[in-house]
């Protein structure tokens, strides 16, 4: 349990370090040490849990309630980030969807937080697939962060050269970009270890906003346009995800993946009601995975440093 908390929270340390570091050498040190620790702990988690079979992890009710409140606050902050950028760049559709998601997030929090202790007793879950995904996130993700240290130096040098030819200067936003990459890792660990759908939704939305900010990294008209294509399509998925959660809650169904699986095999009248939330969650997955007909944002995302 402690290791799962560590994997989720520790990437925030190098993320903060990237924002505070001054100079390439300091950023390299933060990135290499942070990535090395994440990979090492990931391997330890895999060794400890891979042969033990599926496990649910209990969290103290008070702690669980506080973490649910924090996840709701994060959801609202993410909506605020989207709305700020939508207003800044005058994108009407993103503004409308951002308002819808903000209202939905606040309504869902008001519905569920009073009963959060009941629905988040065992919010974390590991099975074989979870462990494989933890390895993928921790090892592959960390290696990407390490590679980005050198890649972003070349990217910035090229950016500065092109700007100089135009008689301009190129701002250095590498600290923010590298911080977003480690924040992305933290959110991915939340996604692959959460049984609680509220927590999973929070991690889901963090990755959505991180992708938006990274796609728009250069602030060129093309980058901004493609970033908004991504955020609009992913917000459609986020709203579908949120609608699915609200449907589950209103109909008295569990807000956990394991609870939904258990209910699906119960053969009760309530089991039939699972069709709608499963469809909504699947729609969210299609947008996130850029599957047809939501695939159009993925090509545009290549304008990001990649």
Regions inferred by a protein language model and the residue ranges of each:
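Alpha-helical multi-pass transmembrane bundles of energy-transducing inner-membrane proteins
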Residues: 176-269
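Alpha-helical transmembrane segments
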Residues: 8-12, 31-42, 75, 98-106, ...
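Cytoplasmic-side transmembrane-helix entry/capping segments in multi-pass membrane proteins
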Residues: 26-37, 91-105, 173-182, 227-237, ...
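Structural signature of hydrophobic alpha-helical transmembrane segments
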Residues: 1-10, 62-75, 128-138, 198-210, ...
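Juxtamembrane/interfacial segments at transmembrane-helix boundaries in multi-pass membrane proteins
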Residues: 50-63, 110-129, 153-169, 199, ...
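Hydrophobic alpha-helical transmembrane segments in multi-pass integral membrane proteins
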Residues: 59-188
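N-terminal signal-anchor/start-transfer transmembrane helix
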Residues: 6-24, 79-83, 286, 290
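Membrane-helix interface "capping/anchor" motifs
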Residues: 20-29, 84-97, 220-222
């Amino acid at each position: 349990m402690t290791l799962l908390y560590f994997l989720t929270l520790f990437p925030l340390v190098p993320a903060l370090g990237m924002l505070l570091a001054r100079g390439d050498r300091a950023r390299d040190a933060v990135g290499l040490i942070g990535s090395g620790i994440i990979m090492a702990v990931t391997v330890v988690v895999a060794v400890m849990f891979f042969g033990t079979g599926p496990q649910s992890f209990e969290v103290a009710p008070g702690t669980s309630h506080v973490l649910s409140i924090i996840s709701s606050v994060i959801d609202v902050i993410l909506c605020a980030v989207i709305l700020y950028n939508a207003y800044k760049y005058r994108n009407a559709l993103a503004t409308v969807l951002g308002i819808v998601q903000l209202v939905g997030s606040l309504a869902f929090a008001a519905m569920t937080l009073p009963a959060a202790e009941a629905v988040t007793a065992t919010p974390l879950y590991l099975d074989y697939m979870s462990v494989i995904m933890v390895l993928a996130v921790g090892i592959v993700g960390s290696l990407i962060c390490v590679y980005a240290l050198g890649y972003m130096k070349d990217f910035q040098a090229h950016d500065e050269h092109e700007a100089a030819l135009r008689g301009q200067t190129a701002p250095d936003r590498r600290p923010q970009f590298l911080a977003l990459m480690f924040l992305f890792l933290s959110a991915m660990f939340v996604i692959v270890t959460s049984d609680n759908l509220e927590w999973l939704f929070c991690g889901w939305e963090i990755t959505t906003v991180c992708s938006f900010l990274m796609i728009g990294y250069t602030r060129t008209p093309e980058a901004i346009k493609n970033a908004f294509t991504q955020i609009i399509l992913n917000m459609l998925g986020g709203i579908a995800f949120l609608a699915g959660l609200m449907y589950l809650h209103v109909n008295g169904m569990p807000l956990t993946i394991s609870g939904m699986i258990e209910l699906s095999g119960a053969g009760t009248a309530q089991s039939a009601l699972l069709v709608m939330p499963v469809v909504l969650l699947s729609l969210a997955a299609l947008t996130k995975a850029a599957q047809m007909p939501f695939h159009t944002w993925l090509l545009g995302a290549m304008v990001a440093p990649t």
